[in-house]
Amino acid sequence: MQHYGVNGYSLHAMNSLSAMYNLHQQAAQQAQHAPDYRPSVHALTLAERLAGCTFQDIILEARYGSQHRKQRRSRTAFTAQQLEALEKTFQKTHYPDVVMRERLAMCTNLPEARVQVWFKNRRAKFRKKQRSLQKEQLQKQKDVSTDGALAASDKDEAPSTLNLENQPPSSTSSSSSMEAEAAPHALGSELSVELNVTSAEQSGSESATEDNATDKEEEIKQHREDLKVEKEPAPGNLSPLCKRLSPKPDSPLGSPAISSSSSGVTGGISQSHSYSSSPLSLFRLQEQFRQHMAATNNLVHYPSFDMATPSSIPYLGMNVNMPAPLGSLPCQSYYQSLSHHAQQVWNSPLLQASGGLPSHNSKTTSIENLRLRAKQHAASLGLDTLPN
């Protein structure tokens, strides 16, 4: 059992120190026989230390020698050559074995313990650097992912807002286009119904409001006055009526509807195209007009409306006798030729068969007048397109 003395230090150490002191005294006594003997400096200093120093210093001197205080090792300063050799070995392996450490110590003139500690510190430094790099990479990935998500969300929001903004205009534009497409059809259907049902005056006023209200109403009033005046001549003479068939010189040739209510459908549609449509479309309009005339003949059932068949003669005659385009002809000669053809038609024996027809009222004559003028308009359209 170990006994502890003063201040917790073991008695064994104190006994060893006393034994050492006793041995030293014995050696000094044996040396006194020599005449020149003097006590050694070491013995004196040791005696002085034992006498004047503290008990802790005695213990430290017994353990570590006369320099009893533990000296701190100075930091090793590696040269460039030593560091280069150590780094090359570290690139090969992070955990060199004892043999590699001994060889490296011999090459670098360093203790093997220093080489081992250097590798330990170098591995710690390497791990720290790797952790920092991983953190940086993770941060960059997070930033990139967040930026990409924000950009994607912005892109998704932008087209959605654009679509929301564009949807009402597109719907309105589609509805407006549908209305624009439906408008000509509605006008055409209304005009055809009015042509079949209403009188000549009402249909004339409808087409007048469509093109030029004041001019057309004046023409219709003038036609009424002419009809009243020319009821007085003989019933067989219908040449004034043929004169009335020719349009006025001051009316423009390019107008789509020449004061005729029955040509309101074709004139209204072709007016929107300003005669820039193809000849096929004009021919289709003419065919539709002929069908419409046949339908009106079937609906009204007047006994005197057999003249619809010879009324196609001026159209054919103008196509045959006038090959030149309409724009190259003087207006007055064109009107005279129209009146000449109309006189031939009205004086033909086909009309003489129904000679007792001046008993028509003003409505029937105005309808005939408007129908023939519509035929004349269709013929002018045919002349415009045939030379091309």
Curated annotation (Swiss-Prot):
A GO BP entry: regulation of transcription by RNA polymerase II
InterPro entries found in the cross-reference section: DMBX_homeobox, HD, Homeobox_CS, Homeodomain-like_sf, OAR_dom
Cellular localisation: Nucleus
Composition skew (Polar residues), residue ranges: 160-169, 195-211
Biased composition (Basic and acidic residues): 133-145, 213-233
Keyword Transcription carried by entry: yes
PROSITE patterns in UniProt: HOMEOBOX_1, HOMEOBOX_2, OAR
Keywords in alphabetical order: Coiled coil, Developmental protein, DNA-binding, Homeobox, Nucleus, Repressor, Transcription, Transcription regulation
Entry's family note: Belongs to the paired homeobox family.
Function: Required for eye and tectum development. May act as a transcriptional repressor.
Protein name: Diencephalon/mesencephalon homeobox protein 1-A
Source organism of this protein record: Danio rerio (Zebrafish)
